[in-house]
């Protein structure tokens, strides 16, 4: 995903003319040094662009206006090097439409004990200048992120990078187009939702596209392109005998390749970043898209089965956040339980559509019977997720607000092989335990579909919820049901009073 390379975070340093030209030059020099060092050595995912020092209301306001209109700018990072009276910032902060981060740092790490004088004190005032700025953020009720620490510290770099990833995901969501091939699975509740409110809140453009329109594109894929993709499959995966050249189900693999190429063309040509399918609307398709959905997810597209556009959008968001990080992200469903005493586990899977970015080993490519959908045997990749930390995330519509529910997981290795299971899977212990996790998930109303990720963490998801202005509920090792119930009740009152 090349998105990050095209984006910028603007760095605006606050000061004022009270201190004179010499001090302002030092402020500008320090800001330039910090910018260049962060860009070169901090491993940040997005380039920082330094703007002129903000010393007046008009200067600061102009930069905020420019940030709003510049499509490369995903957010504004501010630092109060000296004291910068916050009334100068009111128009800028009131009109800013991009994520805001206050970097509460200072140029020097240590106090120059034997040399410190009032010139030094007047130059390095972030300790109280940052508090002045913080008051205005609170007064304006601004969603914002604060990172505290020296600009050379790795922990500060990590937090800056996390915020940049969230800002990039928000930037992407503001322009996200989601193609719904078919409608929601009939009579299912949680996959429904208010698409207008979703566009107001997140920017999601969710629209229906007839499967017949997609079929026309799939049917027009050249045979030479299909053969080239089959060669890629053979190089990337371990093919079962049935789908190898001359195998009894080679035609199913051929059709899956045609589907992938056609679906990718439809999505790319239409500027879509996410899509949904449904097994109840496959008119003109020879098989339920399985392999195509798996591989399109791996290429960065969001996906939701059975018309689940909210999960498709959230998956795309996490794909953007996790760009370049270790671990993968996939559509997922809590499918079935292992209820052995002292070793409760959840087996996550879906009919076909689990992203190979979470595969522990080289996937196996096969085609097998699938009764749901009543079509030909679909191709699919088979694999298991690696052991390690993970998160499940679910975005739901509660009528008066969206709620993002996340559950901390510990993925474990399969204790035994599952040779008859024809789908990819992940096996995990939910935190703090299955009983508490499942009860909390159900009380919070989270969906049976989720986004499973081993690259994005709870901190990033919390920041996303904060900046998007949506409710956030976390289930982790500290969760206790009585406290969770209280939190849900308090949240209900808060959102009715304040939104």
UniProtKB/Swiss-Prot annotation:
Ordered alphabetically, the record's keywords are: Arabinose catabolism, Carbohydrate metabolism, Isomerase, Manganese, Metal-binding
For binding Mn(2+), which residues are annotated in this chain's numbering?
Answer: 306, 333, 350, 449
Q: Name one GO molecular function term.
A: L-arabinose isomerase activity
Gene3D superfamilies cross-referenced by the UniProt entry: 3.40.50.10940
Q: What is its EC number?
A: 5.3.1.4
Cofactor comment: Binds 1 Mn(2+) ion per subunit.
Q: Which reaction does it catalyse?
A: beta-L-arabinopyranose = L-ribulose
CDD domains registered for this protein in UniProt: L-arabinose_isomerase
Answer whether the UniProt record assigns the keyword Manganese to this protein: yes
Q: Its family?
A: Belongs to the arabinose isomerase family.
What role does this protein play? Catalyzes the conversion of L-arabinose to L-ribulose.
Protein name as annotated: L-arabinose isomerase
Q: Which organism is it from?
A: Aeromonas hydrophila subsp. hydrophila (strain ATCC 7966 / DSM 30187 / BCRC 13018 / CCUG 14551 / JCM 1027 / KCTC 2358 / NCIMB 9240 / NCTC 8049)
Q: Which gene encodes it?
A: araA
